């Protein structure tokens, strides 16, 4: 029996979002042994329980108030939302924030030798998918009449098996489509992982814990998107150097011993710092440029 005084978080047991969800919780300082087969894991240092379940169960667990929070792909969340609305329900939940992992797209795909001139090419076709409501919403908006073939896995084999004329499935690289003689023809939904919260009154202690967790998640994401930059920069071109490095705050400038022409500059900059930027810095006279990862960050 779960203790209702503890914060309950549902994550995917295995699959696309599982490892990233576990890493996020670990980097937030939540100490949990998630390497066993247990479906419920208790945090050692916080009043938090982690439920490891199928990804398509997570939205329902949150909407029904069984758990307090869930980490889930927006595609699965939206499909559950549309399913419940089609059944006359009024699902309630809050999206606390979008996360920085789990990116994918839900796309239409057809045989490589089939002509495609837009969604109208699917009129009267049978389409295999695990996302019937997302597919219906999109094609209804396009005025396309079609037949849906619901499959919960191996959707990409449906055309070759004679089950469907086209498919609507998640695409990451497109390699699976290519291996099955298909090509991506239209993106109908783009998704990332998100953190959702159940509707209804939350005990003050739980809400305070959620607020703490959100602050830590924000810090983890900012740290992943940022780098700590150190360099020696010429004083006469300092403004040009700073302009190349987008940062939340102004850099720290320190004098160099015995050098009046240069200063040491330290700053936190976004992940958009690529080799091209470093080459531009060098061209401006910067030297000893170091780019370091950030473990934790709080503004």
UniProtKB/Swiss-Prot annotation:
Query: Which pathway does the UniProt entry assign to this protein?
Result: Amino-acid biosynthesis; L-histidine biosynthesis; L-histidine from 5-phospho-alpha-D-ribose 1-diphosphate: step 1/9
GO process annotations (BP): L-histidine biosynthetic process
Annotated Gene Ontology cellular components are: cytoplasm
Task: Recount the known activity regulation.
Answer: Feedback inhibited by histidine.
- Enzyme Commission designation: 2.4.2.17
| Cofactor(s) for this UniProt protein | Mg(2+)
Q: Which keywords label this protein?
A: Amino-acid biosynthesis, ATP-binding, Cytoplasm, Glycosyltransferase, Histidine biosynthesis, Magnesium, Metal-binding, Nucleotide-binding, Transferase
Q: Where in the cell is it found?
A: Cytoplasm
Q: Name one GO molecular function term.
A: ATP binding
Q: Does the keyword Membrane apply?
A: no
| Disulphide linkage map | none
* Reaction(s) catalysed (UniProt annotation): 1-(5-phospho-beta-D-ribosyl)-ATP + diphosphate = 5-phospho-alpha-D-ribose 1-diphosphate + ATP
| One of the Pfam families matching this protein, by short name | HisG
Uppermost EC category:
transferase
CDD domains in the record, alphabetically? PBP2_HisGL2
Homology family: Belongs to the ATP phosphoribosyltransferase family. Long subfamily.
Query: How is this protein organized at the quaternary level?
Result: Equilibrium between an active dimeric form, an inactive hexameric form and higher aggregates. Interconversion between the various forms is largely reversible and is influenced by the natural substrates and inhibitors of the enzyme.
What does the protein in this record do? Catalyzes the condensation of ATP and 5-phosphoribose 1-diphosphate to form N'-(5'-phosphoribosyl)-ATP (PR-ATP). Has a crucial role in the pathway because the rate of histidine biosynthesis seems to be controlled primarily by regulation of HisG enzymatic activity.
Write down what this protein is called.
Answer: ATP phosphoribosyltransferase
> What organism does the record attribute this protein to?
Enterobacter sp. (strain 638)
Per the record, the gene is hisG
């Amino acid at each position: 029996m779960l203790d209702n005084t503890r914060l309950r978080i549902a994550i995917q047991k295995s699959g696309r979002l599982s490892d990233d969800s576990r890493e996020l919780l670990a980097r937030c300082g939540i100490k949990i042994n998630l390497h066993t087969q247990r479906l419920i894991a208790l945090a050692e240092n916080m009043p938090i329980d982690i439920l490891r379940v199928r990804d398509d169960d997570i939205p329902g667990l949150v909407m029904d108030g069984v758990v307090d929070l869930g980490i889930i792909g927006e595609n699965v969340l939206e499909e559950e939302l549309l399913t419940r609305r089609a059944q006359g329900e009024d699902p309630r939940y809050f999206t606390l924030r979008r996360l920085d992992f789990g990116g994918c797209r839900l796309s239409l795909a057809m045989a490589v030798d089939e002509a495609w001139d837009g969604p109208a090419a699917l009129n009267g076709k049978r389409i295999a998918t695990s996302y019937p409501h997302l597919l219906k919403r999109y094609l209804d908006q396009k005025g396309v009449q079609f037949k849906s073939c619901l499959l919960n896995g191996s959707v990409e084999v449906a055309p070759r098996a004679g089950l469907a004329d086209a498919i609507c499935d998640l695409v990451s690289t497109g390699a699976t489509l290519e291996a099955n003689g298909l090509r991506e023809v239209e993106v109908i939904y783009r998704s990332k992982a998100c953190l959702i919260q159940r509707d209804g009154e939350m005990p003050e202690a739980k809400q305070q814990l959620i607020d703490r967790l959100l602050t830590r998640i924000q810090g983890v994401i900012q740290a992943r998107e940022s780098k700590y930059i150190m360099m020696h920069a010429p004083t006469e071109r300092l403004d040009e150097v700073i302009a190349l490095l987008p940062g939340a705050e102004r850099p720290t400038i320190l004098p160099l011993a015995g050098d009046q022409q240069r200063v040491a500059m330290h700053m936190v900059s976004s992940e958009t710092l690529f080799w091209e930027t470093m080459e531009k810095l060098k061209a401006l006279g910067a030297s000893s440029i170091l780019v370091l990862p950030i473990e934790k960050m709080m503004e």
